[in-house]
Amino acid sequence: MKKLFSILLAAIVALALFGTVLAAPKDGVLDIAYSIVPDSLTPFRPEVNRDAPYFTEICESLGVFNSDKVLEPWLAKSWNTDDNGFTYTVELREGIKDSAGNAFTADDAVWFIQESVARALKPVFNKIESVEKVDDLTFSLKLKSNIVGTFEKIMTESYGITKASFEASPDEFGSSLVSTSPYAVTNFVASSEMTLELREDYWQVLENMPACVSPKVSKIHWVQIAEASQMGIALETGVVEMVMRIPIATGMQYEGNPAYTIEKTSGHQGFQLFFSGAETSPVANDQKLRQAIAYSIDNDAMIMALAYGNGERLYDVHSPIMIGYNPKWENEENYTYNLEKAKQLVAESDYKGQTLSILCSGNGDMPRIAQVLQAFMMQAGINVEINAAEMAYIVANRLDGTKYDMFINSIGGTYLADAWAIRYDPNAYSTGDGTSRKDYALGELLYETWTPEGYTEENVDKVHNYLKDSCIAYGLYNPYNYCIWRTEIGVTDEVHEIAGTIAPAATSYTGL
């Protein structure tokens, strides 16, 4: 990290002296700045930062979602189910080897999945009933239920790690990694930087890989730069050629500058407002009060104030990039800002002037979002206080609806059914759903969408409409993701990952 600061300091001085875009060295290396570099290379990790763009570069998985949101085989050759998604037979490709020369077989796939179940770091592995080897290249996976997206999630979270290499590591791959990936991690400084180089002994022909992960760059250097202005300086001075998910306020400064290419994509989560379902909360059983709050929110003003105009409305509670989202919802009435309507609903509700509480994290944009919401609600005659808490408090209390009346959160997932299950399943926790609500009518609609035959447009619409009409949650806005690169690197044949963002390793360049 000290080395990086020294480089950035020199870059700042150079920028001050010359006041122009400095040329980046053409060394064949793609240098990328991102807000987080892993603190460990272990393949066993929780969901935090799971969607970081470098994970598909350092570890291959059994399957991968492409930009069309279709699951492609990767280490797996094929799979099939004969019982409607409860049990799968998965066949692996032949000849898979890790960078230490160890063969990756069904024994390793079974071991990795069993170890993931035991460590319980990702909830999806708790949905596995059993996993067993069939032969050297085949294993059987039995699920507790055939919920849509479960098998797909397991395939993308099960990595090409051999048991022999993992057990030979003194720190469980904390500081070095052996995997089946075409890239080897040749330099790693935890939470600072990571260098990846193409292996000469990779086990298969690169062109046979899924296009979204087939490498076109021989060497990639990831640098952690958390501070937005420093990320911008690194881009301008050629310390890096690309910055991914740079904060909007900094990223928009490069609009209209031909020296930089800007790509804006829909955020993969967005921000949501969840209403408490606990009986102690005034909002729990007061539909008109919840609807009044929704009508009091000026989404366009919120996007302008918080995302400088670089964002989009949410027409479901959750992000439009999730599988199952229907663009037709964008033509529906969904609590378009109407202050007079909000005031009318407040008068018709059971609200008696109580002070309602908003719980949010004290980090990032959350406190500002809460302040904007507070101002909107006060205009409608609703008193609000904000509890911007430490993350430890959020983790301990986010599911307890007695601790708040409203909770600001940002929920991800590959399928809409994922996000819906996380938040609205009345049987998910001992106290009910993610806000202590026990809405079993909604639960029955949810469960209809969980099975392969039930995941239909009609059933998905039923859940969407129920959430909209009941207003137990409300989609606030979805800020764009900014990815910016120096135009001189000559991006050609751009490849995208599932969320629509550039896949830097799989994209071709003429100017590195």
Residue ranges and their predicted role:
Residues 27-36, 77, 87-91, 109, ...:
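Short, well-ordered beta-strand elements
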Residues 123-165, 171-172, 182-189:
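Surface-exposed binding/hinge segments that line
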Residues 105-111, 138-140, 181-182, 214-219, ...:
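Alpha-helical secondary-structure segments
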Residues 189, 193, 296-325, 365-374, ...:
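Detector for C-terminal structural segments
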Residues 204-253, 383:
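Ligand-site clamp/hinge motif
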Residues 33-81, 114, 178:
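N-terminal lobe/hinge region of extracytoplasmic solute-binding protein
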Residues 77-121, 134, 140, 283-285:
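Aromatic- and charge-enriched surface segment that lines or borders ligand/interaction sites
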Residues 183, 312-348, 365-366:
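Structural transition elements
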